[in-house]
């Protein structure tokens, strides 16, 4: 059966029953239909003094066209922990509309390790992304309105940095001219659109602790500069209060369920390159108060998502992972070993061994954070015993252990062995987590630390303009902020075609951006796309309603 057929065949429980497994009463759930609900802010506040459960991060090797199955493993591990008698909850991100109608498929997991209701989660869900788009757009409108009515703040209209957003892949909107059509429409200027998940509002929603913190962070956003290059903040436009009103419901995490009726929080969805690529702090911290084990994931490979989880999310939220699960597949090892995608079905132990260097690099990087690492081999039907053993032997040589997991095929039955070992490690107290760099380290040195320790680069190339900008931000009081690297997810270098574990390369910094509200400095390496385009044949062409009123073609 396909993923959607498996999801539709599942027996869903009313969301009130799912909430009850975590101790959330019906009065503290704000239902959206029968199978999804938001958890009230008052309930979240009421559990803040409880002790935390164990935090498990699921990450992966650099993504390949063969697919690694990170979300599938996250869901499968959560179900597996519940199967062996642990009270566990899954925390993942929401899906963006744009990619769902572009490249084929949304989905949250796959096979027998999915979160449902699948269609809702990949379409409008509970309206969080619409609220974020609306709040962002309100600020855009208020900036141009301020300029129209006299520009008291003396905004330099050539230096308005706040772009507009829409939750769609639309390359035609990347660079536009706004306010054409005469005096009544304002002052013409260059502008552009990003996709909603690239918005700083999204990053802020996912890092804010509560509504008060949200409003403070929104006010801190830099939206433009004056002629003297001094910043204009969102609070100068007086937009943060109304934006908070638009976001008050979106701040409440969404509760749904897995195919095996276990609880899952699905909340927030920032880009893993331009932002930090993790689900919301409020969902993760709430889950930790309600469950003994919380399984969460971070976007793309461990060099991007896990690094940001450790250095941004954990630092901001005071979190510390008890175990990291690194997802790898035999197919991906073969691809890293030089096998073409069409030939991945044939046994090739030598290619598996050759392709393990990328896996080894990630293991070493993660161990550098002081956290125990378990490799989950996400099983595919074409994997042979010899190939699986080759991965296990390699991982053992790296001071870690690899466990085969068959959750896609068998659900929690297939992930029970992985869950048992992860639980043992998490409960052992072996984790000695520490971030990669201290707050007090200068910004450029933080960038160099990530480049050398995580990417194994020889040097960072940054011109005087960038170095001076970083020094200026330090003088303005932003030197304590963590770094958010924006680079290709496909390689440790900035060349997406450079597979494996390259060393000795340089990391060129093209641009630096201050996300003062979110609280990090974005370092752009190479080309970064904040508004994707649709492919030649977008998946939207194949999406329709069938005669039964069911969605077809979405996954």
Curated annotation (Swiss-Prot):
Annotated EC: 6.3.4.3
CDD domains noted in UniProt: FTHFS (cd00477)
Taxonomy, superkingdom: Bacteria
Membrane keyword on record: no
InterPro entries tied to this protein: Formate_THF_ligase, Formate_THF_ligase_CS, P-loop_NTPase
Keyword ATP-binding listed: yes
SUPFAM superfamilies per record: P-loop containing nucleoside triphosphate hydrolases
EC category name: ligase
GO biological process, one term: tetrahydrofolate interconversion
Family designation: Belongs to the formate--tetrahydrofolate ligase family.
NCBIfam families membership: PRK13505.1
Full protein name: Formate--tetrahydrofolate ligase
């Amino acid at each position: 059966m396909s993923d959607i057929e498996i999801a539709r065949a599942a027996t869903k429980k009313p969301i009130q029953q799912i909430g009850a497994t975590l101790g959330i009463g019906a009065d503290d759930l704000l239902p959206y239909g029968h199978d999804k609900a938001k958890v009230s802010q008052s309930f979240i506040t009421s559990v803040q003094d409880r002790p935390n459960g164990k935090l498990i991060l699921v990450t992966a090797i650099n993504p390949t066209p063969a697919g690694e199955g990170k979300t599938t493993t996250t869901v499968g591990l959560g179900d597996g922990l519940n199967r062996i008698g642990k009270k566990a909850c899954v925390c993942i991100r929401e899906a963006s509309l744009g990619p769902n109608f572009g490249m084929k498929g949304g989905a949250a997991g796959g096979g027998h390790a999915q979160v449902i209701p699948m269609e809702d989660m990949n379409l409008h869900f509970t309206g969080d992304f619409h609220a974020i788009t609306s709040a962002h757009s309100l600020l855009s409108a208020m900036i141009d309105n301020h300029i129209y009515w006299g520009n008291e703040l003396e905004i330099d209209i050539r230096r308005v940095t706040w772009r507009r957003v829409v939750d769609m892949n639309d390359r035609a909107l990347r660079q536009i001219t706004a306010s054409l059509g005469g005096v009544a429409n304002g002052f013409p200027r260059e502008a552009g659109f990003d996709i909603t998940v690239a918005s700083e509002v999204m990053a802020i929603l996912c890092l804010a602790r509560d509504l008060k913190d949200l409003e403070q962070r929104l006010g801190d956003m830099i939206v433009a500069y004056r002629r003297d290059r001094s910043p204009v903040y969102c609070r100068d436009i007086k937009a943060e209060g109304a934006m908070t009103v638009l976001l008050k419901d979106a701040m409440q995490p969404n509760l749904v369920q897995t195919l095996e009726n276990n609880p899952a929080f699905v909340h927030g969805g920032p880009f893993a390159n331009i932002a930090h690529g993790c689900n919301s702090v409020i969902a993760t911290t709430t889950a930790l108060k309600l469950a003994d084990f919380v399984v969460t994931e971070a976007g793309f490979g461990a060099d991007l998502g896990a690094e940001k989880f450790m250095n941004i999310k954990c630092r901001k939220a005071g979190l510390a992972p008890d175990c990291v699960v690194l997802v790898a597949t035999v197919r991906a090892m073969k691809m890293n070993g030089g096998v073409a995608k069409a030939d991945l079905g044939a046994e090739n132990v030598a290619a598996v061994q050759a392709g393990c260097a990328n896996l080894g690099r990630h293991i070493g990087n993660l161990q550098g954070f002081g956290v125990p690492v378990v490799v989950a081999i996400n099983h595919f039907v074409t994997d042979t015993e010899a190939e699986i053993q080759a991965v296990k032997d390699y991982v053992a040589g790296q001071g870690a252990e690899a466990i085969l997991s068959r959750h896609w095929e068998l659900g929690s039955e297939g992930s029970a062995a992985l869950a048992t070992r992860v639980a043992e490690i998490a409960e052992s107290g072996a984790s000695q987590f520490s971030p990669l760099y201290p707050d007090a380290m200068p910004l450029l040195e933080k960038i160099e630390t990530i480049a050398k320790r995580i990417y194994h680069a020889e040097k960072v190339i940054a011109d005087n303009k960038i170095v001076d900008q970083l020094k200026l931000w330090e003088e303005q009081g932003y030197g304590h902020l963590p770094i958010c690297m924006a680079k290709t997810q496909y390689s440790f270098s900035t060349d997406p075609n450079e597979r494996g574990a390259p060393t000795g390369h340089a990391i060129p910094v093209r641009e630096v951006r201050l996300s003062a509200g979110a609280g990090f400095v974005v370092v752009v390496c190479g080309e970064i796309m904040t508004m994707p385009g649709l492919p030649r044949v977008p998946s939207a062409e194949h999406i329709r309603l069938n005669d039964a009123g069911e969605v077809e073609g979405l996954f």
